[in-house]
Regions:
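Detector for small/aliphatic-rich hydrophobic stretches
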Residues: 2-5, 16-92, 114-121
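Conserved P-loop NTPase
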Residues: 6, 25-29, 33, 39-43, ...
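Conserved nucleotide-binding/hydrolysis micro-motifs of P-loop NTPases
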Residues: 32, 98-100, 125-129, 137, ...
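Conserved inter-motif catalytic segment of the P-loop NTP-binding fold
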Residues: 89, 97-100, 107-197, 315
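Substrate-engagement module of ASCE P-loop NTPases
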Residues: 189-210, 214, 230-241
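Short regulatory helix/loop adjacent to the ATP-binding pocket of P-loop NTPases
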Residues: 220-230
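Conserved small/polar residues in nucleotide/adenosyl-binding loops
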Residues: 327
Length: 328
C-alpha cells in the first residue's frame, strides 16, 4: 500500500492543499493551514460502489408521527435556548472557555434526565472515579447514568449500539480518536471524522448526542470550521471566570431560534438558573444618581432591563476620547 502523504488543511474553511500557504486560497485567512494526515482508505469509491444498495424514498405526506419530539432537560433556561427541549436524533455542540461550567451543566441535566431516561456519559478527560466525585458535589444521585472513560470512537460506537442509551454526552470531542486517522487527538482531521461518526450514530438510532468542544485563543471553537456545519445546534457558554454569572447563547439551531439566551449563576453546588435577569442587572442600583439610566433590551422573546452609566470628564487632548465597557 502506498505511503500516506501529509496534507495542509485550513482550520477555518477546511481547504486542503499539498503544500503550505501563509494565506488560505479558500477563505483568505492567514496562518490557518495546519499539517494533517489524511484518512486511510482500504478501497476506493469505485470498488465500494458495487456493494451499495438502493433505499426506499419517503414522501413528505407519508411521514407520520411527531417529527420534532422534544425531551425536557429539567433546566428551563437550557430548554429555552434549545427551542423547547432536546430533539431526538440531534447533535448538539456545547463550547466555552475552560472552567466556564460546560461539564457541570451537562452533569446536572443528567440528574433530571435520569428519572425517565438512560444517559451515557463518555469522558476522555476524566476517570470514572473523578466523575463520581464531581457528581457527589453536584448532588447527582440518579442510577440511570452510565459512565464510560474512553477516547476510541470505535469502542464508543459499539458501546452505544449495545447499551442503547436514550441520551449520550461526549466530553470532549478534542480528546476522541479515530483509528482510520493517523494524526493525533484534537487535530482537524480527527475532530472532523469523529464528529461525522457521532452524527451518523445520532441520525441512525435517533439518539440525541451532546458534544463538548474546546475553544482556541481567539475564542472560536477549536478544530475545523466545518465542525459547526456538521452539528445541528451550536451553543456557547459565556462569562468571566472571576464572576459567578454565565450566559448560554445559541449560535446555530436547526430546530429553534438563535435569539434566546439562558442566564445562570455559578454556586457552590453547581449552576443555578436566573429566571429574572432584569433583577440581576438592577440589583443594588442606587436611586436618584446622575449619569445613569435604565434601558430595555430584547433577547429573544423576553425583555431585559439593564443599567447604562455615562461619565463625562474634562480632557487635555485636542480630540475627545470616547470609550465604552460592558460589565455584568
Amino acid at each position: 500500500m502506498a505511503k500516506l502523504k501529509s496534507v495542509y488543511v485550513c482550520s477555518e474553511c477546511g481547504y486542503e492543499s499539498a503544500k503550505w500557504y501563509g494565506k488560505c486560497p479558500g477563505c483568505g485567512e492567514w496562518n490557518t493551514m495546519n499539517e494533517e494526515m489524511p484518512v486511510s482508505s482500504k478501497s476506493s469509491v469505485s470498488q465500494k460502489s458495487s456493494s451499495y444498495k438502493t433505499q426506499p424514498v419517503l414522501h413528505l405526506n407519508e411521514i407520520n408521527g411527531d417529527v420534532e419530539k422534544r425531551i425536557s432537560t429539567g433546566v428551563k433556561e437550557f430548554d429555552r435556548v434549545l427551542g423547547g427541549g432536546i430533539v431526538e436524533g440531534s447533535l448538539v455542540l456545547l463550547s466555552g472557555d475552560p472552567g466556564i461550567g460546560k461539564s457541570t451543566i451537562l452533569l446536572q441535566i443528567c440528574q433530571f434526565l435520569g428519572k425517565s431516561k438512560y444517559v451515557l456519559y463518555v469522558s476522555g478527560e476524566e476517570s470514572a472515579n473523578q466523575i463520581k466525585l464531581r457528581a457527589v458535589r453536584l448532588g447527582v444521585t440518579t442510577e440511570n447514568l452510565g459512565i464510560l472513560a474512553q477516547t476510541d470512537v470505535g469502542t464508543i460506537a459499539e458501546t452505544i449500539r449495545s447499551e442503547k442509551p436514550d441520551v449520550v454526552i461526549i466530553d470532549s470531542i478534542q480528546t476522541m480518536v479515530c483509528d482510520e486517522c493517523a494524526s493525533s487527538a484534537g487535530s482537524i482531521t480527527q475532530v472532523r471524522e469523529c464528529t461525522n461518526i457521532f452524527m451518523h450514530i445520532a441520525k441512525s438510532f435517533g439518539i440525541p448526542i451532546f458534544i463538548v468542544g474546546h475553544v482556541n485563543k481567539d475564542g472560536g471553537i477549536a478544530g475545523p470550521k466545518v465542525l459547526e456545519h456538521i452539528v445541528d445546534t451550536v451553543l456557547y457558554f459565556e462569562g468571566e471566570r472571576n464572576y459567578s454569572y454565565r450566559i448560554l447563547r445559541g449560535v446555530k439551531n436547526r430546530f429553534g431560534s438563535t435569539n434566546e439566551i439562558g442566564v445562570f449563576e455559578m454556586q457552590q453546588n453547581g449552576l443555578a438558573e436566573v429566571e429574572n435577569p432584569s433583577m440581576l442587572m438592577l440589583s443594588g442600583r442606587p436611586k436618584n444618581v446622575s449619569g445613569t439610566c435604565v434601558a430595555c433590551i430584547m433577547e429573544g422573546s423576553r425583555p431585559i432591563l439593564a443599567e447604562v452609566q455615562g461619565l463625562v470628564t474634562a480632557t487635555g487632548f485636542g480630540t475627545p476620547r470616547r470609550d465604552r465597557k460592558s460589565v455584568v
